[in-house]
Amino acid sequence: MTNPSDRVLPANSMAESREGDFGCTVMELRKLMELRSRDALTQINVHYGGVQNLCSRLKTSPVEGLSGNPADLEKRRQVFGHNVIPPKKPKTFLELVWEALQDVTLIILEIAAIISLVLSFYRPAGEENELCGQVATTPEDENEAQAGWIEGAAILFSVIIVVLVTAFNDWSKEKQFRGLQCRIEQEQKFSIIRNGQLIQLPVAEIVVGDIAQVKYGDLLPADGILIQGNDLKIDESSLTGESDHVKKSLDKDPMLLSGTHVMEGSGRMVVTAVGVNSQTGIILTLLGVNEDDEGEKKKKGKKQGVPENRNKAKTQDGVALEIQPLNSQEGIDNEEKDKKAVKVPKKEKSVLQGKLTRLAVQIGKAGLLMSALTVFILILYFVIDNFVINRRPWLPECTPIYIQYFVKFFIIGITVLVVAVPEGLPLAVTISLAYSVKKMMKDNNLVRHLDACETMGNATAICSDKTGTLTMNRMTVVQAYIGGIHYRQIPSPDVFLPKVLDLIVNGISINSAYTSKILPPEKEGGLPRQVGNKTECALLGFVTDLKQDYQAVRNEVPEEKLYKVYTFNSVRKSMSTVIRNPNGGFRMYSKGASEIILRKCNRILDRKGEAVPFKNKDRDDMVRTVIEPMACDGLRTICIAYRDFDDTEPSWDNENEILTELTCIAVVGIEDPVRPEVPDAIAKCKQAGITVRMVTGDNINTARAIATKCGILTPGDDFLCLEGKEFNRLIRNEKGEVEQEKLDKIWPKLRVLARSSPTDKHTLVKGIIDSTVGEHRQVVAVTGDGTNDGPALKKADVGFAMGIAGTDVAKEASDIILTDDNFTSIVKAVMWGRNVYDSISKFLQFQLTVNVVAVIVAFTGACITQDSPLKAVQMLWVNLIMDTFASLALATEPPTESLLKRRPYGRNKPLISRTMMKNILGHAFYQLIVIFILVFAGEKFFDIDSGRKAPLHSPPSQHYTIVFNTFVLMQLFNEINSRKIHGEKNVFSGIYRNIIFCSVVLGTFICQIFIVEFGGKPFSCTSLSLSQWLWCLFIGIGELLWGQFISAIPTRSLKFLKEAGHGTTKEEITKDAEGLDEIDHAEMELRRGQILWFRGLNRIQTQIDVINTFQTGASFKGVLRRQNMGQHLDVKLVPSSSYIKVVKAFHSSLHESIQKPYNQKSIHSFMTHPEFAIEEELPRTPLLDEEEEENPDKASKFGTRVLLLDGEVTPYANTNNNAVDCNQVQLPQSDSSLQSLETSV
């Protein structure tokens, strides 16, 4: 039968249809996905004959999915497109060269070199006039004078080398980051049904017609239409701006859109649009992902004088973006607000980044001052010597000669500046981070934001989940309470009556996600594989242990027959499924935290399988005799129950009425063993000065038992264990607001937060970060796996998401993904983070020594000899050594266990410690003494001609060649000294493990030999004899001996030494700058300093920000940041027939986590989660069972004291003491023991 829609297809669509051999075209599907609710249903039913018929047109099976035939998949990609957003083309090498040329100091040096080059060819009339000053006059010197152009050319050549090296580094960095980006994209997979099998497929390989399995926590990778759903709720705020979750069902609204988040429930959808044809892809295209086209349009608009009355896209609070309709009052009002808008605080940069920028500004100021002073003194010296002392007149024919001198002085000054400015600093940071990130992958840390790597080195606290992180996430049922009997081991199925066994099997098999399965082991003799939710897998394993087949039950009751599903969420803490009874009526199976489910039970099955009354007293006895002993063994307790309904259908939306009067079938104890390596890892954290806190949804007894096994709690420690409710009661005032002062009294001793919600976790993390208690501010790392962990992961300094158990939303919010979900991987991240910090410090120690010596030598030489002993080209070579090569050598040191034996650095600890300052000044002292002796007495010692006060264009001298060679060799050996920055004696320790370091030092030494022996005039060098080389080498090796002497001097005795490179302290922040970050304070200092052109130093920030090319996902804020904010969206781009509603588009959903969408290929990465936009306080969602609190007075009376591990009583109200041995704990009595125990699934 022909469908009506076949007759209304446009001609071009029919052509496409015939070409693709599908019953619908790309444009038809695009238009279909723009519809919502009833409109969409009408279109699907009227024009396509329902979802089933649409699947037929797309040649796919709603149950089996696509066959997976490669030819069919390729055909679908050709017709409907790939599920990727075309990335922006990477910058070409020439573009990177052009960017490197923009450096201010290099530009000035280039100009000076060109002037020098031009003047060298100019032969003024008065060149041979003695009144014009000291010029080469001998025949030999005249040849040299004619070769005066060489110096200018050599400087230009050196600049070209520096530029090419910089561009190559940038190119290789971008290439590496794109490689890392591809790795992240490969990690993003989605559940797809193909050929009847559920497989995990990379999102870029999804095609139109695929059947996708949708579940809680997923980030939808493509547009689709719902085929089957269970209590499905979607957060569409990323597209519509609507903050409420949207219920999706077959009869109301089946449209699922890419970039939206599954907040609840599960289901299946048929994919209808991918890539640029999906709703997210269309909007990204409109917003200008293809910047080149936008730029062309803007240029044309300017040429044609087009008035700019298009829409403005504005960012707000760094997280939200809103596009207003044309000429709307709302848009006008917002424009007015924009005019009055105050600068919004940006997200705080990393600790190291802020310190580096601040230090670079300080060094830059000092370098600029010394450079200007050098030029001034050289000119002053020249003027006084020629026009005052020698009383020479200023002759017109002498002007070009004087200009040549001035240009030479200027070149020397600029060269001093080039050496002084720490240009290698950003390179060292980037190399160190990139190297660390690459190596961290092998340690199961997939770094999404590069700065998180070094921030982890500063971590002072880790708030860790329990399940899967501290434990193995290999759950098994080991105890059960059924029919009034507590089974300490799994019983034989023969002990149960058939009807009881059926209730257990059905209650578990039906009331679990059908994606949770137990599969045979991969290797013979291995453990069965658990797929899906681990708690549900434990229950399914219990069914298997009872010799029953859960799959047979599911085949009898397929997902399509489930009448109503109340899926698990952080509010319900339970899951319930309703099915129709064959004999009429309904049956509902429920499972969840034992305390919550038992509170809703009024009957329980006895030994005979009969339902008997279950009173409050019975419930309390059960808690005391069954649940508490299980919890003290570290078991999670889950209750299974059911309820029958008659034929009269109740109001299923009234959960409080539905989820009552249950009959308890069983309570099971689930074991999740502690990972064997975790106690040792936590001991290392304690040694490293890092406090580990466990934040879990389990009850207090289970949490305390696990924390004790892990080593978080030890007997005798004065630490707190609190439940979420008690925690909130202690930190909030009468209005329910969190008070920092109250929180500051709790968190220092808090070690376990049990029965906590995601909001509690966020409150704790925010409180610790914002706290000013203690000597240093805390740097907090957090682990999370659920959708609701997004706010805490965002707030934390470093957010760790679980790679295996984590939802897409949690991964999008994280900085690092733990690919093995293991706590020990976090400890490795700490090691790498500290190693990055040490690598930067090593480089700083080395570079600042070079800076100090080179600048002082040039300055002093200028003052005394009217020339710099180190020539411009030589200094550029030194600059190349200490920038590119040294950063490569010192930034690639592998970490060692000794890094964990030190305390965290903290936010305000300086980059340059007093020990480092001792090393810098000590080695600078040695080098300066040697250089000055060589400059002023070297010719006598070596019996050679002096190179001081050489005339203009004079040939290179052996004297100054020895000075240059000795200087470079001292830097090479000091590079070995710089490997150790904490006063260690053995600087060669582990040197052979770092092949890069050895290669760089050896390579630099070989290059130095070639420069000295064959460099000639361009490098101002002449060849040296063997004895001169040996002397230079001996003085260089003296650096190592001198280093031993310096390390023997105790730093404590040198109290006059000061530290440098602090972060911004509170006292330094003015009132109007409180919202700004470290970078902003550094920039404000620059503005005060009136050194506008010196803002080229911000290359450091720019180069560190190459991190952004590596970050995953994208935000529209990132898209728009690259555009001129005055540029409006061209509404004409939107076809009237497919008008996209963008009135509040993407409101409160676009975030900073990822800033450059053009680096992303997968559309799956394009949206981040609206929950990440955190207000100062998050409203706490009340739990269902909180409404059933019998008496608030009893509750407060119940929690009166906290018992510490050493038995000491504190005034904190807490129902859950911290005693390790549950049998010795005197629990306070109350009407209901359940008030002390609340567990989450």
From Swiss-Prot:
Residues 114-150, 377-409, 861-870, 935-952, 1016-1025 are extracellular. GO terms for molecular function: ATP binding; ATP hydrolysis activity; calcium ion transmembrane transporter activity; calmodulin binding; metal ion binding; nitric-oxide synthase binding; nitric-oxide synthase inhibitor activity; P-type calcium transporter activity. CDD domains: P-type_ATPase_Ca_PMCA-like. Changing R693I: Mildly decreased calcium transport activity. Mg(2+) binds at D785, D789. The keyword Acetylation does not apply. One of its GO terms (cellular component) is plasma membrane. Gene3D superfamilies: Calcium-transporting ATPase, cytoplasmic domain N (3.40.1110.10), Calcium-transporting ATPase, cytoplasmic transduction domain A (2.70.150.10), Calcium-transporting ATPase, transmembrane domain (1.20.1110.10), HAD superfamily/HAD-like (3.40.50.1000). It is an enzyme of class 7 (translocase). It catalyses: Ca(2+)(in) + ATP + H2O = Ca(2+)(out) + ADP + phosphate + H(+). Residues 1-92, 172-356, 428-840, 892-911, 975-993, 1048-1241 are cytoplasmic. Its EC number is 7.2.2.10. The active site is at D465. Changing R675 to K/D/L: Decreased calcium transport activity. This is Plasma membrane calcium-transporting ATPase 4. The gene is ATP2B4.
